[in-house]
């Protein structure tokens, strides 16, 4: 097989005795639909589907595990990136069994999608290899799936083939994946802190609005996960407490004026303030202002050494990621009204796409 007729180095050769195995190999792969958000908040067309290729050591044992994939509901066959597809496949195969009983040592994930220079083909656009995935990595991903699972969005589409006096509309169920789970899976598969790079999900107002869907799941995630450092957990709790006081004050002021509390504007102000920080000095100034607006903070009073340790450490991006994680996972005063406003705008944009 030669992928490019003009480039000899792209020629692939295999001995005849492997023909039968190669012929049936696609039947042992796992396939996922990808929904990956770009930084502008729109779906990335370069990664639309993923093929998970297992590295099989025992075909009979793997065949038993593969049955779990075959009976998986369609809602679980969508992923948010390479690592998410790979770990989702492994979680599906493993179920309650030990990793040693799967008959595989690892797997490769290949993505396919559209590229600007070729509208007619769906070429390979990315790949990643997984070897010897640790049980604790899969345990963390299992928690991420539990808290940030796929959701089903029902869309109305016009049916050009419809006749008569009917509306000519059909209902389409679309499985929408979690961008946050995609980030978490990339981090834990690479041995990084699960929240690292969280600021990438807040680079634009549109992207931040989409992340609003993850609030309930993120709150559950930060509450249930075993943190690597207790100072990280205390820092997020301090952020939650500061937001709770700020939203409570806004609600009280709005009630006196008989107005709607501007929770959405305050959320955007906090987001842009944290995202404007480009070095340790500006971030510390922003966090100092953030906490000063948060009134009396019991977490700061009791655990100020741990919170301060996060703020003054050399890795200032870590403090920003944790602060934005706290903002995204806040669940308390004003969150119901804020959630309705953010989700209403995000749902309309999803339906347009």
Where are these regions (language model features)?
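Domain-exit/linker segments immediately C-terminal to small folded modules
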Residues: 2-174
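Long, contiguous all-alpha helical interaction modules
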Residues: 102-353
